[in-house]
C-alpha cells in the first residue's frame, strides 16, 4: 500500500544491481553493506565510502554525517521536511521506523541521500587527488571487505564461563565489603567518596579533599598504594566490581549465539575511530578488555576463545614505535642513530636496552623516557611516570638528549615540518594536520582556528600542538603498517578476530599457518630496519602473557 512496489520485485532488482561489477558508492558503507549481506545478497564490484574519503581529506572535522558534509562541500542538505512531517502524523520515529511509512513520503528523502553521496564522491575524488591521498584511500578501500568479514566472523566467547566468573567475582566483592563492615560498621559504597571517607574516619586515617568544596577525594592510585589492609579491601573490591559490571556484563550483553560481533571503526567518524587512522571498537569496545591487572586481566581475556580445533594466536609487532623512530631517523641520515640501526640489522635488538647503554641509565628509566617522548608526553607527566624529583628528572633528560641525540633531533625535525607545512605525512601517505593556532609566546591559551586566533591573539601566532607531531607520525605509520598487514593476510584468506594496539589475534590451526602469518606481517611494509612479529598461542586469549 501507499505506493510501495511489490517487495520481491524490489529485492530482485536490488540483487541484480548489487551483483553487477560496477563501482558501488556509499556513505558509511559498513552500515549498508552489513545490512545487504545479512539479507543474503551478494555485493560485487569495488565499494567506495565517501565517509572514509572525507576523513582522509580532513581528520579534524567534528561531524562526518552525510548532511553536514553535503552542506560544507555541496551547499545542499538532506531532504527531511516531508519525511519528518509524515512521521509526526503517523506517530513514529522518522529514522528508526522509517520503514513503516509509505514510499511516497520516503522517496524524496532517499533520492536526495543518493544525490548527495554521488555529488560528494565527485568532490572527494578531486580533493584526494589534489592532496595526494589516492594511495592511502586505495589501502582503506581494499581493506574494507576484510573488515566486513571480520565483523561477521566476530570472536567466540565462553558464555557459560562468563556467567560463572561473574558470580565468583560478585561473591569475592561481597566478602571484601563484609570484612570492611565487620571492622568499621560501615556499609561502604565503593564508588562514593563520602562513603569511603566514613571508613577512613572510623580508622582515623588521613585522606585528601578537593580544593574548592573540601569534599573527600580518593584516587585509584591513592587507594591501591595505601598500606592499611581495609583500604586494600576497598581497592580490590573496586577492581573486582569494575571487572564484572563493566567487562563481563558487556560480554554477556553483546554475545549472540556464542559470539561477539563488535562495530569496527575503520577511521575517524561520528561513531568512533581515530585521527591517526588506528582502529577503534564499539558495542563493545574490545580494546578496553583489561590486560594490565595480572589477576583479573587473564581471567576476563580467558572468556575469548578460538575457532574449534584451533589455538588462539597472538601476533604482536615487536617494538613497533621504536623501530619507526629508528626508521625515520635513518631516513634523515642522522649519524647518531646508525649504531642503533646496525644493531637491528645484525641481531634481534632491544631498543630500550640499547638506549639505556648509550645514556648509561637503567633500562626501565630509558623505556619510560623513550615512550614518553614518542607519545608527546610533557615534562611534568614524564617526571611523574619516572617517579623522581624535578631536579632528578631534569638531570635524566639532559643526559638522555646528550647521549641519545637522534630522538630529540627527529622530534624537532618533525615538529618544524608540522609548523611550516601544517601537516605531516605517514609511512603510506596518510596526512595528519595541525589546523589550530595559538600565541607565539609561551603560556596557557586556547588553541583556535586561524581566523579566530588572529582576531583573539593578533598577528604573532603559531600552529598549536606541533610538539605532538612525532607521536602522530608514529601512531599514523603504525596504523598504516597494521592495515597493510591485515590486507596482505586477507589476500590469503586470513581474517583476524581482534586488532588491539600492535597485535592481531587470529585462530591458528598449526605452526605452518602461524609461521606464514608472521612472514606476511613482517614483510607487509619495508622499513630501513627489519620488522619483527612476536607470536604466542594458547587455548584462549587469557593464556597469552
Locations of regions flagged by a protein language model:
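Conserved RNase H-like, two-metal-ion catalytic cores of nucleic-acid enzymes
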Residues: 1-68, 72, 292-297, 326-328, ...
Amino acid at each position: 500500500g501507499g505506493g510501495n512496489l511489490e517487495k520481491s520485485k524490489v529485492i530482485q532488482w536490488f540483487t541484480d544491481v548489487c551483483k553487477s561489477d560496477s563501482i558501488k558508492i556509499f556513505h558509511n558503507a559498513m552500515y549498508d553493506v552489513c545490512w545487504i549481506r545479512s539479507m543474503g545478497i551478494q555485493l560485487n564490484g569495488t565499494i567506495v565510502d565517501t565517509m572514509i574519503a572525507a576523513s582522509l581529506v580532513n581528520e579534524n572535522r567534528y561531524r562526518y554525517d552525510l548532511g553536514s558534509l553535503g552542506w560544507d562541500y555541496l551547499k545542499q542538505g538532506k531532504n527531511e521536511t516531508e519525511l519528518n512531517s509524515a512521521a509526526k502524523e503517523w506517530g513514529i520515529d522518522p529514522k528508526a521506523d522509517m520503514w513503516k511509512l509509505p514510499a511516497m513520503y520516503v522517496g524524496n528523502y532517499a533520492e536526495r541521500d543518493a544525490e548527495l553521496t554521488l555529488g560528494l564522491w565527485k568532490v572527494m575524488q578531486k580533493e584526494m587527488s589534489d592532496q595526494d591521498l589516492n594511495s592511502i584511500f586505495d589501502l582503506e578501500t581494499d581493506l574494507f571487505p576484510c573488515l566486513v568479514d571480520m565483523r561477521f566472523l566476530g570472536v567466540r566467547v565462553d558464555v557459560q564461563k562468563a556467567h560463572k566468573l561473574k558470580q565468583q567475582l560478585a561473591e569475592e566483592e561481597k566478602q571484601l565489603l563484609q570484612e570492611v563492615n565487620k571492622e568499621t560498621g560501615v556499609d561502604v559504597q565503593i564508588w562514593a567518596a563520602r562513603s569511603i571517607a566514613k571508613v577512613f574516619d572510623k580508622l582515623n586515617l588521613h585522606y585528601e579533599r578537593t580544593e574548592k568544596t573540601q569534599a573527600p577525594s580518593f584516587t585509584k592510585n591513592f587507594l591501591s598504594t595505601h598500606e592499611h589492609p581495609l583500604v586494600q579491601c576497598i581497592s580490590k573490591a573496586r577492581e573486582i566490581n569494575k571487572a564484572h559490571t563493566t567487562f563481563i556484563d558487556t560480554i554477556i550483553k553483546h554475545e549472540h549465539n556464542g559470539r561477539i560481533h563488535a562495530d569496527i571503526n575503520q577511521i575517524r567518524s561520528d561513531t568512533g575511530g581515530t585521527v591517526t587512522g588506528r582502529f577503534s571498537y564499539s558495542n563493545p569496545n574490545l580494546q578496553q578488555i583489561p590486560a594490565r591487572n595480572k589477576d583479573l586481566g587473564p581471567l576476563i581475556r580467558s572468556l575469548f576463545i578460538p575457532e574449534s580445533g584451533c589455538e588462539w594466536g597472538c601476533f604482536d609487532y615487536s617494538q613497533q614505535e621504536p623501530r619507526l623512530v629508528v626508521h625515520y631517523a635513518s631516513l634523515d641520515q642522522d649519524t647518531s642513530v646508525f649504531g642503533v640501526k646496525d644493531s637491528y640489522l645484525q641481531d634481534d635488538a632491544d631498543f630500550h636496552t640499547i638506549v639505556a647503554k648509550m645514556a648509561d641509565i637503567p633500562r626501565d628509566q630509558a623505556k619510560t623516557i623513550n615512550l614518553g617522548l614518542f607519545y608527546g608526553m610533557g615534562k611534568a607527566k614524564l617526571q611523574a611516570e619516572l617517579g623522581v624529583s624535578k631536579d632528578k628528572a631534569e638531570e635524566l633528560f639532559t643526559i638522555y638528549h646528550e647521549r641519545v641525540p637522534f630522538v630529540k633531533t627527529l622530534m624537532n625535525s618533525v615538529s618544524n615540518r608540522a609548523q611550516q607545512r601544517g601537516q605531516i605525512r605517514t609511512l603510506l601517505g596518510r596526512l595528519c594536520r595541525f589546523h589550530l593556532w595559538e600565541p607565539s609566546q609561551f603560556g596557557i591559551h586556547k588553541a583556535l582556528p586561524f581566523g579566530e586566533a588572529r582576531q583573539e591573539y593578533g598577528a604573532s601566532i603559531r600552529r598549536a600542538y606541533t610538539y605532538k607531531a612525532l607521536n602522530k607520525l608514529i601512531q599514523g605509520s603504525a596504523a598504516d603498517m597494521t592495515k597493510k598487514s591485515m590486507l596482505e593476510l586477507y589476500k590469503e584468506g586470513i581474517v583476524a578476530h581482534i586488532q588491539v594496539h600492535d597485535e592481531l589475534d587470529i585462530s591458528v590451526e598449526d605452526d605452518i599457518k602461524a609461521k606464514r602469518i608472521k612472514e606476511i606481517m613482517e614483510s607487509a611494509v619495508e622499513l630501513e630496519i627489519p620488522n619483527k612479529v612476536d607470536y604466542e598461542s594458547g587455548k584462549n586469549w587469557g593464556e597469552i602473557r
